[in-house]
Amino acid sequence: EVGGPTAWVGGPARAAPPHNPPTTRPRQTRPPPARGPPTASTTHTAPSGYRTARDPAGFSLAVPQDFTRERQGERVFYLSPGQTFRLGIKVAPPETGGPAAVMSRAAADGPSTNPGYHDGRVTETTHAGHPAALWEFSWNGFSAAEGPRHTYDLCWEEGGRMYDVWVSAPVGKVKEAREYFDVAVDTFSVTAS
């Protein structure tokens, strides 16, 4: 799955409008309770139905129990059975302009990297006190069988690295996708790699 000029996002969706588009603007991600910067000892509790994935790429986050890990180049994916839901993570050096510029460049390239790209928007926000950007869009999917998809993608810089977490799902499952996305982002921690 690809996205943006640096391929930050997790896959395309159909040009048809979503069946159940979010009814509100993207919310700002909630920072965790007040505390110091994440460390290797920082832990987050996975909600019921989730497990904490301590990834060898240097992070941990909560993923649904039945999601399996797959490395694809510079990205790590946690995939649902049948790959209906794709939770992706990319860790990279910071890029010029920070998260908002990265997501804006990716959104500008959306039509060339995500077939049928539409309804893309980038919102500046914060994540755990760090400047961040949320990119949300719909697209056709990579194949007719895959069908229309919707993607939520949050990018931020922390500790000299750029982190990108996204969830891509069928447009008819945006509510479930948003839950997976929110849990992943809210439980994400940098760990010793």
Task: Place the predicted regions along the sequence by residue.
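Hydrophobic single-pass membrane-targeting/anchoring helices
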Residues: 1-38
